[in-house]
């Protein structure tokens, strides 16, 4: 069984469209021009638990593709895994663009030649929820329990209190 990843790109043409090698787990799934006609890529990914890497190696940009007012650009507009959009904050938190020994974390626009890398894990929904918990924990100390991602501030404490009250009632009934 395989899962499906859909990569949606955009490009800005200037004396030609950007060229790219698109890889999943170091296997090339597309090599060529990314333009208005070819900007959506359906990529099968192996199912089962494991880490995966989507990479886009941009190449072929020269001085002819740059001017003072315009430049050739390649952009990642979105990624869907099994039809579910990867939230932008997860894309930004788990991606980087490397060029000329420089690493830019969270960049979704590629101006120079270089390699963009997005690391993710399957099963995707579990990994996505873990990423949401980690992201929310940066801004809210109340997200301490793994299942509390769907609870708002202080709701985990209230839920624990309600459960304790139910146990007390059960003890009274049992005695």
Region roles according to the model:
Residues 1-3, 13-15, 86-175:
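Activation corresponds to long, low-complexity, non-globular regions
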Residues 6-10:
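Short edge beta-strand/loop segments characteristic of extracellular beta-sandwich folds
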């Amino acid at each position: 069984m395989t899962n499906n990843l859909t990569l949606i790109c955009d490009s800005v043409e200037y004396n030609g469209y950007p060229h790219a090698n698109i890889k999943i787990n170091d296997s090339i799934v597309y090599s060529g021009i990314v333009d208005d006609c070819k900007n959506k890529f359906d990529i099968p990914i192996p199912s089962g638990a494991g880490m995966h890497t989507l990479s886009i190696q941009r190449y072929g940009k020269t001085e002819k593709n740059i001017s003072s007012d315009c430049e050739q650009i390649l952009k990642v507009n979105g990624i869907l895994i099994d039809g579910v959009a990867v939230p932008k904050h997860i894309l930004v938190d788990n991606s980087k663009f490397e060029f000329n020994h420089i690493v830019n974390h969270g960049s979704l626009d590629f101006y120079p030649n270089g390699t963009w890398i997005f690391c993710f894990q399957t099963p995707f929904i579990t990994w996505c929820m873990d990423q949401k918990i980690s992201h929310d924990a940066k801004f809210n100390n109340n997200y301490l329990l793994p299942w509390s991602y769907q609870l708002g501030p202080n709701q985990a404490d209230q839920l624990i209190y309600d459960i304790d009250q139910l146990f007390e009632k059960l003890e009274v009934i049992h005695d």
